[in-house]
Amino acid sequence: MSELKQKQIFSEKALEKEQQSDSPELTAQKTFSEKETFVPVKIEEDRIETEQELQLEHVIRPRPGRKWLATSVFATFAGLVGWQAVDSVVTAVQTADWLALGWVGFITAVASLGLGAIGKELWKLRKLRNHFSIQEEAELLVHSDSVGKGKVFCEKVAEESGVLAENPGFDRWQNSINPAHSDAEILDMYDSMVVSQQDKLATKVVSQHATESAALVAVSPLAAADMLLVAWRNFKMIDNLSKVYGVELGYASRIKLLRAVFVNMAAAGASELAIDAGMDLMSMDLAGKVSARAGQGLGVGILTARLGLKAMALLRPLPWYPDRQVKLGTIRKAVVAKVASITMKP
């Protein structure tokens, strides 16, 4: 009979050493190649601007029309009316036809009022064309290295925009510039100190009209009436923006400006804004909680905001600076929040 083996006591440390000696590949050094390097990715919380928003920077101004044509037609019409009035008065006096003389006086007065209104519209159209010329001149100065023209140009812009000499921003700008500054630097300071104040007021106007239009369409069951009211409010918004920037508009100049705004909106792809708005709804976890009517109101509000931003770009005297440009996303968030607050189902 064989002898029994003596007992063996295994310690935990000895076992670990034995395992490490049996499998040395577990502790061997590993070298990663460049392709296997892991790069941490930073997650951005803010939504990246869409290509449609970046296209807002490009402004398409209306082409200058034939100034001589409108002036010639107006002068010819005014001359013929005056000639006819004088001839009719002379004929009525010679024939002692006092009734005809009275009618001639009445028609001449009405024609004079009409000519005055037409002349006023032509004058406002000319001022709007001059405003666009100032914008183009500002773009040239911003991208040039010239010296000596910036101060005179900005003072002219302030006069055209109705900026008073007592304006704090304008006074600060005057005390900040010196002969060593280039024209581009002077325009940059004028934009940051004077025009930026107008931009803040204009942004409030656009945001207010956009949110109100969105809420109006979202809660009202009358689609046709809503669209008429929205169209009227858009005209009102453009009028308010023109007052902020000191651009006087008449009926003809207002239509010309509105056409320019629509051209810019079409060029920027305004029809794709509903996709951006839908992404905002998803990000706010509102999908399935708002009605189709609320979606329509949201679309109207976004389009109103874009119309307002395009009007701002056409009405402000200087081109947008990238770091101070009003973004569509700022107003869009306010519109989405407004629609969500009044249409979310409990």
From Swiss-Prot:
Residue ranges of the TM segments: 73-93, 98-118
Region Disordered, residue ranges: 1-30
Residues forming coiled coils: none
GO cellular component terms, A-Z: plasma membrane
InterPro entries: DUF697, UPF0283
Membrane topology: Multi-pass membrane protein
UniProt-annotated location(s): Cell inner membrane
UniProt record similarity statement: Belongs to the UPF0283 family.
Name this protein carries in UniProt: UPF0283 membrane protein VP1870
Organism, as annotated: Vibrio parahaemolyticus serotype O3:K6 (strain RIMD 2210633)
Organismal lineage: Bacteria, Pseudomonadati, Pseudomonadota, Gammaproteobacteria, Vibrionales
